[in-house]
C-alpha cells in the first residue's frame, strides 16, 4: 500500500507509553535509535492502486509467527515503542490476529488497511490494535478508480462503520494528481463518520504510475488542509506538517529529516535503509542478525537530512520532534515529553 505510514498516530499515545519513551531516551543519551517501526507483512494485495509499487511484486516466503516475534524482540531491544503493520493488505494474512496480539504485548500497535476485509476480520483483530488507518483517496468512483477495483469505496466505508466503535480509527488519504479536488469531500466524510483523517502526498516510485501532484496546484490544497486543521476539523496531521511542506517546497526553509527515527522491515525481515522512500523496500540484512543500535549510530545519515523529496508523515512528523514549540509537542506527542522537547534532545 503506497504512501501509507502506519505509525502516524503518535499524537494519540497514552502517558504510559510516553514514560516508556522517556526512559529509552534517558537510557540512550545522545544516541540515535528508532522510535517507530513499520513492517510490511506481505506485498500481496486485493487491490491494484495506481500509485503503489508493492502489489506488483511477488511475495517470497513470508515470516512465520516465530520469526515475527523474533523481529519484534529485536526492535524492542533497539528502543522501538511503536510498531505499525502494512502491506500489501495485512488482513490477507491468515495469522494476522496472532501477529497483532504478539505486537500489542510489546508495542503501541497500529495497522493500515484498504478496509475491504475489515468488517469480516474485526473480531479477530479488534482487541490487538491501538489504532487503525483505513485508506480512502476520494469519494465513490474516484476512490475506486485510484484503487483499481470497483466497490473499494463501499467496502472501506462499511469497514470504518463496523470498526470505529471498537478501535481508534482514522482515514488515511493520499493526495495525487487525480484527486486534489477531493480534499474537502474526504474531510466532510470523516466528520460524518465520526473519525479523523490523515493526509499524505503521493511520491513517485520507480515501478508505479507517476501520480504525484503538480506542485502549484498542490500548494492550494495544502493551504486548504492547513486551514481546516486550524479551524479544528479532525485532521491528524500537525499544523507544523503543513507549514513545513509549504516552507520547504515553496520557500527556502527545508526541514531537517531524521529518517533514523523510523525503521522499516520488509516481508522477509530485512532492514530497509536509509528509508523506504529512497530504498523502495530493497533490504538484505535480517533484523534479528543485526545490532540495530550499533548500525544506527555508525551509519552516515547526513546526506539524507536535507532530502525533503517526500512528505510522508512517518518521516516528517517525527523529524519535528525536537522543535522548541511546546504547543506542537502537546498536540503531537505526549504531555509527559514536553519538558524534554523544550530542551535539546540532541537528536
Model segments located where?
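Generic structural signal for small/hydrophobic residues in well-ordered secondary structure
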Residues: 41, 45-46, 103, 134, ...
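A structural motif corresponding to the C-terminal lobe/cap of the Radical SAM core domain
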Residues: 158-161, 188-192, 209-235, 282-285
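Short acidic, glycine/proline-rich loop/turn micro-motifs
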Residues: 143-146, 208-211, 246-247
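Radical SAM/AdoMet-radical enzyme domain recognition
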Residues: 65-86, 92-204
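Short, catalytically relevant binding-site loops at active-site mouths
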Residues: 203-207, 241-244
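Short glycine-enriched, charge-decorated loop/helix-capping segments at active-site entrances
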Residues: 55-62, 145-151, 212-214
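Conserved alpha-helical substructure of the radical SAM core
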Residues: 2-124, 128, 323, 331-332, ...
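Accessory C-terminal segments flanking Radical SAM cores
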Residues: 38, 195, 220, 233-338
Amino acid at each position: 500500500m503506497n504512501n501509507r505510514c502506519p505509525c502516524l498516530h503518535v499524537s494519540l499515545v497514552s502517558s504510559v507509553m510516553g514514560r516508556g519513551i522517556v526512559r529509552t531516551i534517558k537510557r540512550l543519551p545522545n544516541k540515535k535509535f528508532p522510535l517507530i517501526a513499520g513492517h510490511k507483512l506481505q506485498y500481496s494485495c486485493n487491490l491494484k492502486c495506481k500509485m503503489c509499487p508493492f502489489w506488483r511484486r511477488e511475495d517470497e516466503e513470508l515470516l512465520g509467527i516465530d520469526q515475527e516475534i523474533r523481529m519484534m524482540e529485536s526492535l524492542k531491544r533497539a528502543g522501538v515503542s511503536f510498531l505499525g503493520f502494512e502491506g500489501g493488505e495485512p488482513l490477507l494474512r491468515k495469522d494476522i490476529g496472532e501477529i497483532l496480539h504478539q505486537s500489542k504485548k510489546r508495542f503501541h500497535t497500529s495497522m493500515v488497511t484498504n478496509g475491504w476485509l475489515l468488517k469480516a476480520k474485526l473480531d479477530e483483530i479488534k482487541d490487538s490494535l491501538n489504532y487503525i488507518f483505513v485508506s480512502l483517496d476520494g469519494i465513490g468512483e474516484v476512490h475506486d478508480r485510484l484503487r483499481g477495483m470497483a466497490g473499494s469505496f463501499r467496502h472501506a466505508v462499511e469497514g470504518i462503520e463496523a470498526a470505529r466503535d471498537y478501535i481508534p480509527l482514522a482515514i488515511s488519504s493520499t493526495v495525487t494528481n487525480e484527486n486534489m479536488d477531493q480534499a474537502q469531500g474526504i474531510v466532510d466524510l470523516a466528520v460524518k463518520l465520526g473519525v479523523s483523517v490523515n493526509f499524505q502526498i503521493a511520491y513517485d516510485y520507480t515501478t508505479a504510475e507517476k501520480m504525484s501532484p503538480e506542485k502549484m496546484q498542490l500548494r492550494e490544497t495544502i493551504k486548504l488542509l492547513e486551514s481546516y486543521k486550524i479551524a479544528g476539523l479532525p485532521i491528524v496531521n500537525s499544523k507544523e506538517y503543513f507549514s513545513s511542506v509549504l516552507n520547504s517546497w515553496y520557500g527556502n526553509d527545508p526541514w531537517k529529516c531524521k529518517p533514523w527515527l523510523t525503521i522499516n522491515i520488509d516481508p522477509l525481515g530485512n532492514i530497509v535503509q536509509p528509508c523506504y522512500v529512497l530504498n523502495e523496500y530493497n533490504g538484505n540484512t535480517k533484523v534479528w542478525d543485526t545490532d540495530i543500535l550499533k548500525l544506527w549510530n555508525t551509519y552516515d545519515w547526513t546526506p539524507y537530512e536535507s532530502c525533503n523529496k517526500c512528505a510522508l508523515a512517518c518521516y516528517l512528523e517525527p523529524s519535528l520532534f525536537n522543535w522548541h514549540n511546546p504547543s506542537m509537542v502537546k498536540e503531537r506527542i505526549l504531555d509527559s515529553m514536553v519538558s524534554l522537547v523544550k530542551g535539546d534532545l540532541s537528536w
